């Protein structure tokens, strides 16, 4: 989001142009800029004030800028809680679960899905990008220039924080249509919320937990636990040696769930080792700037529905990867996919 640079440096402000295939940082020289369509719409949604100042009609589609406003005090409260400063603004200082919680609480971050209804036809996004302006940055850090240019162009109040999301919507017809009516629907993308931790030792062990939204009391019962390995050749790398050992837990849920519930490993797993030349031999050395999320962990796919048993659907959760077989019981974390806000529709034209 932010740059650490000489605060006295002031780059020249370029002419404001928006391109369908471009972003805030550049575009193809072959592409023509879109024609601005003033909208000047404001609304409240998901705990934020939103402004849609303009859209841009391009040869390939429609581009819309979404401006989400956040009060300064909300940002300061968030930064104080997580002790965020110039020396601590990196994911390497936080566990995967803490990173998920930070993303959930970040007042300058909201993952949403916009849909347009143009002349009665639905338009979906093909791609997008965003910039963030934070008025509470500590000394030594400044907002990136592109965020400042966007605020200046749209005359947005710099005493607030802003997330400006640019979404591109391809035309649904071969020709650029005349805009007769235009509406927007905002839908929150489900977010992953970490829940209680647990450990299991053997088949037959069980763990009960409540869904944080529905309040349903679920019981997880272990059916199988086994050690497995991934062949090193599956990673397809001659430069890195990857951990290959992991634990698979197969389990059932009662009652059977129609809600999105997953299980992941609380452990980050072992880091890959880079094969570095030492003398005449290749010696693996651990590197801190690489990570593995192929199997388990909060960022990886962790649950697979594997079939039916007499007890109900059978699921499988995979642990993080390690260089040695996992001897201790894995500490698992429940994970819920949740929407906190209902969708809303706004007439733009």
Predicted regions and their residues:
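Alpha-helical, hydrophobic structural elements that either
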Residues: 1-288, 311-349
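Short conserved micro-motifs on helix faces and helix-strand junctions that flank
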Residues: 296-297
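Ligand-binding pocket scaffold of soluble enzyme catalytic domains
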Residues: 293, 304-306
């Amino acid at each position: 989001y932010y740059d650490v640079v000489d605060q006295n440096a002031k780059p020249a402000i370029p002419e404001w142009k928006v391109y369908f295939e471009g972003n805030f940082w550049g575009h193809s020289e072959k592409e023509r800029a879109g024609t601005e369509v003033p909208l000047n719409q404001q609304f409240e949604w998901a705990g934020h004030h939103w402004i849609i100042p303009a859209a841009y009609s391009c040869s390939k589609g429609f581009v819309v800028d979404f401006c989400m406003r956040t009060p300064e005090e909300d940002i300061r409260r968030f930064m104080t809680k997580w002790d965020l400063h110039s020396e601590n603004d990196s994911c390497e200082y936080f566990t995967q679960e803490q990173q998920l919680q930070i993303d959930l609480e970040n007042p300058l971050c909201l993952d949403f899905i916009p849909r347009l209804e143009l002349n009665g036809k639905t338009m979906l996004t093909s791609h997008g990008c965003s910039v963030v302006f934070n008025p509470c940055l500590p000394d030594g850090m400044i907002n990136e220039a592109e965020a400042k240019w966007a605020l200046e162009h749209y005359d947005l109040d710099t005493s607030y924080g802003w997330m400006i999301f640019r979404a591109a919507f391809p035309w649904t017809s071969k020709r650029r249509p005349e805009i007769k009516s235009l509406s927007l629907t905002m839908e929150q993308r489900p977010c992953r919320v970490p829940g209680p931790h647990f450990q299991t030792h053997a088949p037959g062990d069980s763990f009960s937990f409540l869904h944080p939204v529905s309040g349903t009391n679920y019981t997880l019962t272990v059916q199988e636990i086994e050690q497995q390995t991934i062949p090193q050749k599956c990673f397809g790398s001659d430069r890195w040696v990857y951990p290959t050992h992991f634990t698979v837990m197969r389990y059932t849920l009662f009652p059977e769930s129609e809600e999105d519930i997953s299980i992941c490993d609380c452990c980050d797993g072992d880091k890959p080792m880079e094969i570095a030349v030492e003398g005449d031999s290749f010696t693996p050395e651990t590197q801190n700037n690489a990570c593995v999320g192929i199997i388990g962990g909060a960022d990886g796919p962790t649950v697979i529905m594997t079939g039916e048993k007499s007890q109900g659907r059978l699921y499988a959760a995979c642990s993080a990867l390690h260089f040695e077989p996992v001897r201790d019981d894995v500490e698992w974390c429940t994970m819920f996919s949740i929407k906190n806000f209902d969708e809303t529709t706004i007439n733009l034209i």
